[in-house]
Amino acid sequence: MNRAPVFLLVEPSPIVASAYGRWLENAFSNSQCLVASNGAEALQLATDNIPSYVLIELSLPDKAGIEILIQLRQALPASRIIATSWFQGRWLIDGVRSAGADGFVSKDKLPKELLSLWKIFIE
């Protein structure tokens, strides 16, 4: 029996994090959403809870999102990690993939594209 999906949302805005959390809990029944507002919290929650899925905003208040992404990938080798940002460009997508992300979704494409990715990963 598979365990319920555990998501880690790394998002500095409490309003955005709350909206994402509600959206994920509605889209995936029995899921659990952990929320970190900065890189240090993200790393602590990741090591304490081993989430299966991570959504990380690349603009964080304490450290560069790419740096946290690299550390999350090292701590969570089996987890699926998606990076997100308002910034876009091939350079950014290539950078997050090199850092260990499984994908990138621009914030202006959320939640539709993100939902499609999570469904692929979960199924």
Model segments located where?
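Acidic catalytic/metal-coordinating carboxylates
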Residues: 38, 64-67
